[in-house]
Amino acid sequence: IIILLIMILAVGAVFFKRYGSSNEEADKEQYYGIENSDDLALIINNEVVKKEESSAESSSDSSTDSVIPGKVFDGQYYVAYQVLRDKINSRFYWDANERVLLYTLPDGNVSVSENSSEYTAVNETKSEDYVILKTDGDIAYIALPFIQEYTNMEYSVEQEPNRAIITSKWGEIETAEVKKDTQVRYLGGVKSPILTEVKKSDKVTVLEDEDDWMKVATADGYVGYIKTKFLKNQKKEKTSRDFTEPVYSDMTEDHSINMAWHNVTNAAANNAVQQVLASTSGLTTIAPTWFSLADTEGNISSIADADYVNYAHTAGLEVWAVFRDFHGG
């Protein structure tokens, strides 16, 4: 009997080892790609952003091999410019030569210098109670609350490890409620390491349905897998945020545009407009190169000519003047 009992226990142990659930916990710093104590993990629109992803998308204009997506400086949370541009708000522009961050509004620019809590919004100087723009070499890091001021986004911050959960895409999502206390695992399968525990009635966002397992995102920034049988009340929801997007004016035409460039290098060259147009047909627009930078102070030189415009209009053409940025202009 004893031998039989031992055999049953041995078989049970082998069976559990093969099919039982693992209690191994995932290395959270490795999961988020955290290498240093001041790194900030970023979860943007239910995606964990890691160094390799941010550097791959920014390799064309960055002198670094890799970019840490987020940082913590003096208790404030910052996002790398490359990540901001690619994944949150592409209207921000970091000028690494001038060391200034720019954002264009319909009525003017917002500009921030590095290591400054002050910024210029159109023609007004404003300030925050934190440094807005930090730098690490040529990599710019922008404070999250400043980004939010000009972006339709929400964010929350969690510790252990430091991470920011950012939502900048709004619309329809799928949610579910947790039936009972269980685990979210790194991959679908009981042997996969545990990322976090979820409690009964917790709400998760459903990202993918993989039959026995669901890929979900938790409110505190974990993206992993949970057994389908532990979820209930799956439903579609609309998400939105009260934010007024800036309206940028533009011009439209009610016809196709057939445009020709006219390389005008000096004032006398304007006199050739009649000859130039005589050799064309079907044009709607002519674009003479009339303007250029005159000096390093930003002054502009012009060789625009009223007679040129009048002749073009008589010929039924619109004139779109061009700012020359070549041939020393």
Where are these regions (language model features)?
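Extracytoplasmic/secreted envelope proteins and their assembly/folding machinery
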Residues: 81-85, 144, 148, 270-273, ...
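A short macromolecule-binding patch
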Residues: 179, 220-231
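Conserved, mostly hydrophobic/aromatic
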Residues: 286
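Conserved residues at the C-terminal ends of beta-strands
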Residues: 289
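Chitinase-like catalytic core of GlcNAc-active glycosidases
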Residues: 254-263, 267, 277-280, 292-329
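Short, solvent-exposed loop/turn elements at domain surfaces
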Residues: 51, 184-187, 215, 266-273, ...
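Primary recognition of N-terminal secretory signal peptides and signal-anchoring hydrophobic helices
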Residues: 1-210, 232, 239-252
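SH3/SH3-like beta-barrel fold
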Residues: 103, 201, 213-218, 226
